Curated annotation (Swiss-Prot):
Superkingdom in the source lineage: Viruses
Entries under Pfam families matching the protein: ETM (PF17577)
Protein name: ECORI-T site protein ETM homolog
Keywords from the named record: Early protein
Gene: ETM
Protein species of origin: Orgyia pseudotsugata multicapsid polyhedrosis virus
InterPro entries: ETM
Length: 109
């Protein structure tokens, strides 16, 4: 659980984190509520990383599947989205160490 000890996910002020679930020592999922139905996401920020990681991920933006590859800088990774995303899954790798991360965005109920 040491790798996930300080990991945080932030989207923007139009998306509120409803649930953060740490399932195993290297797997976490975050669920966000969308404040308005048409709120688009500029970027997803993953911060609190203790080591340099490289992010390999996939997300659904609108009707398209987008592949992501970003490197961490200063303990955080900023993944540009630029649209209404519903789902983001990523594997953060550092040599043999990895973190699996899932981000779900749902309309507020």
């Amino acid at each position: 659980m040491d790798a996930l000890q300080n990991v945080r996910v932030h989207i923007d002020k139009h998306h509120a984190c409803r649930r953060a679930l740490f399932e195993t020592p290297n797997r976490a999922s975050f669920t966000f509520d969308r404040a308005t139905a048409d709120a688009s996401i500029a970027s997803i920020e993953i911060s609190g990383l203790r080591r340099p990681y490289e992010c390999f991920g996939k997300m659904v933006v609108g009707d398209a599947l987008v592949h992501v590859r970003e490197r961490s800088a200063g303990g955080k990774i900023v993944v540009p989205v630029n649209g209404p995303a519903d789902f983001f899954t990523a594997v953060l790798k550092n040599g043999l160490e990895f973190i699996k991360l899932d981000v779900y965005v749902a309309p507020r109920i």
